[in-house]
Structure formats: C-alpha cells, structure tokens
C-alpha cells in the first residue's frame, strides 16, 4: 500500500524576482493537464528553487532527468536540502567503469563485458525503486540511464517479502522466500543482499539500505519481534510492527516463470542455430550454442547468470521486439517529469537507442548473443514520449523540440539578487592577447576571476603557457581531465589558487562561479557548435553571477549567432533593469558557499584534517550527529579496504567529536 505524505519544502527564502509568476504558470499548466511546458530560465535565476516549489504545489511523484552523473549528484544534494522530510532518491548507472561486450569482425576480437559496479549507487537505485512502492512523496534524480531496461515492476512488487509481528510463518519458510528474491545466506560476510541465521533469529540486510539490517525473532511458528538494527554495532535503532523486503535484484523472476523463460530461450536458440547453419556460419553456431547453454545451466541451478539482462524479454515473458520495462514503469499513472538542461538531455535520450543497437547487431550476427538480446535496450524516443505523462523542460536555451511542443515559453529572467545579464563588448582580434592580459590584470587587482574560452586544444595550451610565463595563476580545463578533478579546479579558482581558467567547452557541469567577473570568448566569429547562438548564450551566462560581470568577444565580424546572442542578452538586460528601477533593487553578487568536493573523493591533506578536527567547536547538535555518522561510515570503509592508519585517525576524530557532544 502506497502511503500518502505531502511535500514539505525547507527554505528560509520565499520565491522572488521572476520565480513567483513562473511557479504559478507551471503549476496551473500541470493542474490543467498540459503535457509539455518549458521554463526558460536565465543563468542564476534560481531554476532549482522554482522546480522545488512546483513539486511542492503539484504534489506528484517526480522524475528529474539530468544529462550526466555529476549534474545529477549536484541536483540530488540540492533537492535533499529542500525536502529533508520527503524521499529524495538518486538513480544513475551503477558502473564506475563499464566496457560493454563487443566484437570487432576485422580483427576477430571479442571484448568481454567488463564492469566495476559501485555498491553505494546500486543501493541508491534499490532505494529509489522501493520508495515508489512505499509512498507518494518521491523525487528521483536520474541520469539518462533511467531509460535503460529494468525488471518487470509488477514482478518486483509482487515478490516483496512482507514480515509482520504476530504473523504465522516458520523460520525455514522465510529463508526460502528470501532465496527466491535473490538474497543469499552468509553468516560470515554480512552485506547488502544477504541474510544470516542465529537460532530463532534471522537478520536480513535489505538491498536498499546502507547500514541498517532487519532482525526478525521467531517464537515457534510465529514472528515474535521485528527490529531495525545497526548491522555493525548491533545497536537497536527502533522496533517495527511491519517491514517489506524488496528483491535483491531488479531482474527477479518467479520459479515457474523462470521455467517458461528457459523453454522460450531454448526454442529461440534452436531456431537461430538452424538459421546460422543454413547460412554455413558453423563457427558462429557453435559459439552461440556453447555460450547460451552455459547461461541456461546457470539459470537452472542458481536462478541467474552473468549478463542475465540479455534475456530480459524472455524473463518478463514479453513478445520479441516489445518495449522494455524501465524506471519509468515503476511510477504510477499520475506523475511528473522534469528535464534539466533539456537542450542537452533530450538529444541524449534520442541518441541512446541507435548507439546501443549498432553494437548489439554485430554480437548477434557473429553468434555471441541470441537476436532477443536486442530487446535489452534503452527506449526509443517515441517510446519515451508514450511512457511519460506530463513534462517540464528546464533550460536557459531551449532546443527545437521544446520550442515546437510548447505553446508558450515560461520565462524566468529576473534574478532574486537583481543581477543583470553581463555587458558584452565585441573587439577586433588584432593585438587580442595583449589586450586580454591587461583586462585579466585589472580583474586580478580587484580579486576577481576570469574564464577564457578558445576553439582548439592547442590554442588553450599555448595561451595557458603564455599566461604562466607572464606570471598569471592559470589552469587549463580539457576533456581528458576527470569529472572530479574538474570540480576541484573550479573550487580552486573560486578560492583564489588560480585567477584564470582557460578551456574549450566551459559549459559543462559546475561552472557557476560568482567570483567570475569576466568571460572572454576568443574566435567568437568562427561559426560552429562551440560558437552557435545557444553555446554563446550559455557561455555569456557564466558572467551573470557577479555585479561587475562583463563579456569580451574577440571577432573581426559579427555572425548571425553573435547577433542573436547580443540581441537576446540586451533584451534580458532591459527587462532586468526595468524591474530593478521599479522596485529600487541594487544588484549584488551572489554569495555562494564553497563546498568541498563530493565526499567520494576524500582528501587526505593536512588542511582537510585540521579543518575536520576544528569542526566540533562550531557545530550544532544536528550537524555534529551528521558528521559523526559520516566519519563512522568512512572509518568502516577504510577498515574494509585494509587502510588501518586512516581508520585509526578517523576513530580518534570520532572520540573527539563524541566527547565534545
């Protein structure tokens, strides 16, 4: 039974600027049943806050799709702060590293699937799907992986093992049910997706939980007591009357269905082998027979096999070629989709199917997979459209799809801080580097930062070297730098370790920096992807978080894209200036906290340790408790990774925190 809870928005601010009218229009549109709406929100106008207010007013389960994991992570943190009492979940691909299986016919090379699964993200995925069956105040932040195949939601829901105090059930029946939903018994290494047995006590570690296990105590053939327990310390967290244990895998199938699925796979194998032999593809036939029979044997014995998702069409007993189940099917009938940065995310959703199909076709043709493996795939764009109900697109520069499907753009141009879109100055390319250096020096003297965008890697490198020789603290952002390193460089720019960052594509995640007062666009008149009207507006927006924000474009002619960007920016400035004059608002630079890099990258440098040991003196009781929990988590992880020195340091830190409490 899905429980009802209202969305409770936690914020010290009320909607300001353009936010109230944008919220009102979107909410009205959703309530009137509008299918497509677009929020055209300029950079820095508080689009996330607007989205949060819409969710609160509409009160529907919501899926928010971002175009990469990092952006999804940022949104997840923000929405968790806005909705601490509701279920905010995170659903992205659980692979830290993923090499899909592939075959290169020209060199006769088969590349086996190789992947490293992030256990924490897997737990968050299970938490997301189980939340949708437990309550209706759910917000799931997802990457495009939400359109990839997942198990049948009905099967997932029906196979839930429900335990209740006073229920008649003997211990062995519970153990059997747990094995059916792919939990395994492990009395020694107790981890997610396992259970352990001690006399009349069964402890289960749900796949959707991080540190909490369920202790079920029996008295004869009756459940006597259910408790939530910390799996490591054994400390009882609370008593429970009832608990629902969701399957340990999304690809879970009942025994009788598994038998039918195996029969279907055998039948398909027989037909496919005949086809291959008729075409005289004997090597391919032998390869397919050997691989498929091995998988079938594993399914009979264990209930699953490696790469079981390739048989998903049979396991869910769907007709060949039918639409796969995805996260979208786990939502009920009445729900909302918000697509963040829709001008990037929608083309990504559109392109997923074709890329996946091309690779799988080669595997099928050469006998590595049955043709039905093609049905383990992401959704086609038309299927995505059919499965979604109401959509809100969010972007500073909506793409053609959003423009075509929305009758009215809901504009959010006025910033709560009164900040204007930056002034734009177009200058000739003659002596541009000397001119640029003098502009940078002016900003350094005012303790402000600069972003410079170039067109080629070589130019970025040469410019960076030249600036370093001129004594400027500069770093260079390029595509080979890992996501977390990018975030670190941005953080260092904000903190003043660097004054300038040079890069080709500065539109990627995490580049909203209030300290930046100047954005420089070199070769602005070279038409192309990086100098299209959409890219130019996005790049200009990077200077819109500082009251002294300016943009300099170096160009010898004004292209159509430049003209569009100049006109659109001026249009927005006029609206913003009129609003400020009407209400007597003075623009002021955003004051944004400098967050540490995502916790997955714990720094070990002295400053970090010093900072952490100083924390207790200036923390509230709630913050202290949260810090204790985080350090405990890191300590256990360090011990598990055999990094005992780090675990000892963290333990000492814990003692200090607890003694201060």
From Swiss-Prot:
Keywords: ATP-binding, Cytoplasm, DNA damage, DNA excision, DNA repair, Excision nuclease, Nucleotide-binding, SOS response. Residues 604-625 are annotated as: Disordered. Residues 625-660 form the UVR domain. PROSITE patterns: HELICASE_ATP_BIND_1, HELICASE_CTER, UVR. Residues 28-414 form the Helicase ATP-binding domain. One of its GO terms (cellular component) is cytoplasm. InterPro entries: Helicase/UvrB_N, Helicase_ATP-bd, Helicase_C-like, P-loop_NTPase, UVR_dom, UVR_dom_sf, UvrB, UvrB_inter. GO terms for biological process: nucleotide-excision repair; SOS response. A motif (Beta-hairpin) lies at residues 94-117. Residues 432-598 form the Helicase C-terminal domain. SMART domains: DEXDc, HELICc. Its main location: cytoplasm. It is found in: Cytoplasm. GO terms for molecular function: ATP binding; ATP hydrolysis activity; DNA binding; excinuclease ABC activity. CDD domains: DEXHc_UvrB, SF2_C_UvrB. The keyword DNA repair applies. ATP binds at residues 41-48. It comes from the Bacteria. PANTHER family: UVRABC SYSTEM PROTEIN B (PTHR24029:SF0). The UvrABC repair system catalyzes the recognition and processing of DNA lesions. A damage recognition complex composed of 2 UvrA and 2 UvrB subunits scans DNA for abnormalities. Upon binding of the UvrA(2)B(2) complex to a putative damaged site, the DNA wraps around one UvrB monomer. DNA wrap is dependent on ATP binding by UvrB and probably causes local melting of the DNA helix, facilitating insertion of UvrB beta-hairpin between the DNA strands. Then UvrB probes one DNA strand for the presence of a lesion. Forms a heterotetramer with UvrA during the search for lesions. Interacts with UvrC in an incision complex. The beta-hairpin motif is involved in DNA binding. Belongs to the UvrB family. This is UvrABC system protein B. The gene is uvrB.
């Amino acid at each position: 039974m899905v429980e009802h809870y209202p969305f409770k928005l936690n914020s010290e601010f009320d909607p300001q600027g353009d936010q109230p009218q944008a919220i009102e229009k979107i909410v009205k549109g959703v309530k009137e049943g509008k299918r497509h709406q677009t929020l055209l929100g300029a950079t820095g106008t508080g689009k996330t806050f607007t989205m949060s207010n819409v969710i609160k007013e509409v009160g529907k389960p919501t899926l928010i799709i971002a175009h990469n994991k990092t952006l999804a992570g940022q949104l997840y943190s923000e929405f968790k702060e806005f909705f601490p009492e509701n279920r905010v979940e995170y659903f992205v691909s659980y692979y830290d590293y993923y090499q899909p299986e592939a075959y290169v016919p020209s060199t006769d090379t088969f590349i086996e699937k190789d992947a490293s699964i992030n256990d924490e993200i897997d737990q968050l995925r299970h938490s997301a799907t189980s939340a949708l069956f437990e309550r209706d105040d759910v917000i799931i932040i997802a990457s495009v992986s939400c359109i990839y195949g997942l198990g049948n939601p009905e099967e997932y829901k029906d196979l839930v093992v429900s335990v209740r105090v006073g229920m008649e059930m003997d211990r062995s029946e519970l153990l059997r049910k747990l094995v059916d939903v792919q939990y395994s018994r492990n009395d020694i290494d107790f981890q997610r997706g396992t259970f352990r047995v001690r006399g009349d006590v069964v402890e289960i570690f749900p796949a959707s939980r991080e540190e909490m296990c369920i202790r079920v105590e029996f008295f004869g053939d009756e459940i006597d007591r259910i408790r939530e327990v910390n799996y490591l310390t054994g400390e009882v967290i609370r008593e429970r009357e009832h608990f629902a244990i969701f399957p340990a895998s999304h690809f879970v199938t009942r025994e009788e269905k598994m038998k039918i699925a195996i029969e279907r796979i055998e039948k398909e194998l027989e037909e496919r082998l005949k086809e291959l032999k008729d075409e005289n593809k004997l090597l391919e036939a032998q390869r397919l027979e050997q691989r498929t029979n091995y998988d079938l044997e594993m399914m009979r014995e264990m209930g699953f096999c490696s790469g079981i998702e390739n048989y998903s069409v049979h396991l869910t007993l769907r007709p060949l070629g039918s639409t796969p189940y995805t996260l979208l099917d786990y939502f009920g009938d009445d729900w909302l989709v918000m697509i963040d940065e829709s001008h990037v995310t929608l083309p990504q959703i559109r392109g997923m199917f074709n890329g996946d199909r091309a690779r799988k076709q080669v595997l099928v043709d050469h006998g590595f997979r049955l043709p039905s493996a093609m049905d383990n795939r992401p959704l086609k764009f038309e299927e995505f459209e059919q499965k979604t109900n109401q959509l809100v697109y969010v972007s500073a520069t909506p793409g053609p799809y959003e423009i075509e499907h929305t009758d009215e753009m809901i504009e959010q141009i006025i910033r709560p801080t009164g900040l204007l879109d930056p002034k734009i100055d177009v200058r000739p390319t003659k002596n541009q580097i000397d001119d640029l250096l003098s502009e940078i020096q002016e900003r350094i003297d005012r303790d402000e930062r600069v972003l410079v965008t170039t067109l080629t890697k070589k130019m970025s490198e040469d410019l960076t070297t030249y600036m370093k020789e001129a004594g400027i603290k500069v770093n260079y952002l390029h595509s080979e730098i890992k996501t977390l390193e990018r975030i670190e460089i941005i953080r260092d720019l904000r903190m003043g370790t660097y004054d300038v960052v040079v890069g080709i594509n500065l539109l990627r995640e995490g580049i909203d920096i209030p300290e930046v007062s100047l954005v420089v666009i070199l070769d602005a008149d070279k038409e192309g992807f990086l100098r299209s009207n959409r890219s130019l507006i996005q790049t200009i927006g990077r200077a819109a978080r500082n009251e002294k924000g300016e943009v300099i474009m170096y160009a010898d002619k004004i292209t159509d894209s430049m003209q569009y960007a100049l006109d659109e920016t001026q249009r927005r400035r006029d609206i913003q200036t009129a609003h400020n004059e009407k209400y007597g608002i003075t623009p002021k630079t955003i004051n944004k906290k400098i967050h540490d890099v995502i916790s997955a990258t714990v720094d070990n440098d002295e400053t970090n340790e010093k900072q952490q040991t100083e924390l207790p003196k200036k923390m509230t009781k709630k913050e202290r408790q949260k810090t204790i929990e985080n350090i405990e988590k890191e300590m256990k992880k360090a011990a598990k990774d055999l990094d005992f020195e780090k675990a000892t340091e963290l333990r000492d830190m814990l003692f200090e925190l607890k003694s201060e409490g």
